[in-house]
């Protein structure tokens, strides 16, 4: 069977080695005679798995000791709510930087839940010669006392990425759902990081939260117990039954990433993959991209065919060639190739070859 390369934005492809290992031990995990899906989350065997997963993630991301690592329910949207309820209190203020669809969605959720609290926002994307560009404000010039500033460094729908780390006088809350572990960051600059698992961590249903200890002292609002960071810390992410199979697969992904050389190594490959695809787009008048070079996403490469009437044929022929899930988000249309950590370089080589051949045939 020919290779199939899955460019889905999420749930995304998992490393082949992880999938094969999960397949091999699906019915008998760790010599238990049963699946990892069937054992108690409080058993010593599963606790050992969770401890190793956290240890591996801490090593990969160089997470300081004054940060808690939580494995939670709810995905990214669940954390939109949890951030507000855990940190804003009844009279707090927060600032949301809007760079695309997901940061906008976080803002809408915050406004819905804030009550008497104040939610401010800044649109940080402008048009430069018809292309989307991020313009980061000087936050130190803003006279306000915010509990936190929220932003999303990578917008999967819009194909926009912010590579410069934010400089803020207030704690930074970041949605890293689509960039976590794709490149190195300084965790100590953040008050809280959250990430839905279904892009660079594992399957959907799990979210990772990395929260600095002092953030847990901020006033909170009444909320669901399973989204209470303080309870999650107190109960080692097991206030209720966690998504155990997703946790297991996340642990395997962390181990796989360590075995491949860690984040510094995968970051070089990710950069190479993105550069290769953007060079194809820029080098062919058949395709176009709407983002300035400095803010083009490495994880989610969006592009359009100049002749949009060929979109359906492009997707049909790509599917036949084993290149799946290339259709752009319904809001923006066009095409999108998601190049998360699990996407091998060979997948991008195959996509570029197909794009060049398709353009030559239909130009």
UniProtKB/Swiss-Prot annotation:
Belongs to the class-V pyridoxal-phosphate-dependent aminotransferase family. SerC subfamily. NCBIfam families: PRK05355.1, serC_1. The modification N6-(pyridoxal phosphate)lysine is found at residue 199. The keyword Metal-binding does not apply. This is Phosphoserine aminotransferase. GO terms for cellular component: cytoplasm. InterPro entries: Aminotrans_V_dom, Aminotrans_V_PyrdxlP_BS, Pser_aminoTfrase, PyrdxlP-dep_Trfase, PyrdxlP-dep_Trfase_major, PyrdxlP-dep_Trfase_small. Its EC number is 2.6.1.52. Its main location: cytoplasm. It is found in: Cytoplasm. One of its GO terms (biological process) is L-serine biosynthetic process. One of its GO terms (molecular function) is O-phospho-L-serine:2-oxoglutarate aminotransferase activity. L-glutamate binds at residue 42. Gene3D superfamilies: Aspartate Aminotransferase, domain 1 (3.90.1150.10), Type I PLP-dependent aspartate aminotransferase-like (Major domain) (3.40.640.10). Pyridoxal 5'-phosphate binds at residues 76-77, 102, 156, 175, 198, 240-241. Keywords: Amino-acid biosynthesis, Aminotransferase, Cytoplasm, Pyridoxal phosphate, Pyridoxine biosynthesis, Serine biosynthesis, Transferase. It is an enzyme of class 2 (transferase). Its cofactor is pyridoxal 5'-phosphate. Binds 1 pyridoxal phosphate per subunit. It catalyses: O-phospho-L-serine + 2-oxoglutarate = 3-phosphooxypyruvate + L-glutamate; 4-(phosphooxy)-L-threonine + 2-oxoglutarate = (R)-3-hydroxy-2-oxo-4-phosphooxybutanoate + L-glutamate.
């Amino acid at each position: 069977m020919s290779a199939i390369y899955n460019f889905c934005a999420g749930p995304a492809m998992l490393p082949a080695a992880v999938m094969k290992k999960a397949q091999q031990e699906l019915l008998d995990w760790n010599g238990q005679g049963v699946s990892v899906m069937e054992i108690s989350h409080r058993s010593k065997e599963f606790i050992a798995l969770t401890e190793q997963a956290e240890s591996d993630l801490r090593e990969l991301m160089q997470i300081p000791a004054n940060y808690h690592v939580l494995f939670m329910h709810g995905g990214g949207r669940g954390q939109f709510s949890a951030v507000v309820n855990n940190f804003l209190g009844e009279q707090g203020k927060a600032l949301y930087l809007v760079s695309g669809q997901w940061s906008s969605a976080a803002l809408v959720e915050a406004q819905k839940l804030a009550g008497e609290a104040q939610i401010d926002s800044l649109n940080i994307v402008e048009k430069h010669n018809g292309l989307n560009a991020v313009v980061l404000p000087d936050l130190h010039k803003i006279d306000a006392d915010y509990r936190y500033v929220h932003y999303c460094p990578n917008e999967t729908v819009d194909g926009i990425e912010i590579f410069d780390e934010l400089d803020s006088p207030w704690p930074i809350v970041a949605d890293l759902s689509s960039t976590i572990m794709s490149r190195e960051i300084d965790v100590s600059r953040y008050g809280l990081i959250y990430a839905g698992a279904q892009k660079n961590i594992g399957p959907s249903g799990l979210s990772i939260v990395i929260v600095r200890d002092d953030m847990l002292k901020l006033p909170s609002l009444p909320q669901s117990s399973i989204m209470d960071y303080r309870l999650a810390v107190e109960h080692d992410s097991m206030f209720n039954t966690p998504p155990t199979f997703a946790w297991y697969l996340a642990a395997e992904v962390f181990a796989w990433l360590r075995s491949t050389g860690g984040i510094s190594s995968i970051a070089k490959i990710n950069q190479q993959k993105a550069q290769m695809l953007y060079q194809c787009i820029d080098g062919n008048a058949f395709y176009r991209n709407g983002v300035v070079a400095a803010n083009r996403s490495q994880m989610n490469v969006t592009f359009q065919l100049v002749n949009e009437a060929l979109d359906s044929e492009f997707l049909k022929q790509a599917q036949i060639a084993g290149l799946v899930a290339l259709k752009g988000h319904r809001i923006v249309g066009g095409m999108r190739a998601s190049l998360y950590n699990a996407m091998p370089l060979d997948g991008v080589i195959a996509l570029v070859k197909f794009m060049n051949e398709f353009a030559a045939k239909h130009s």
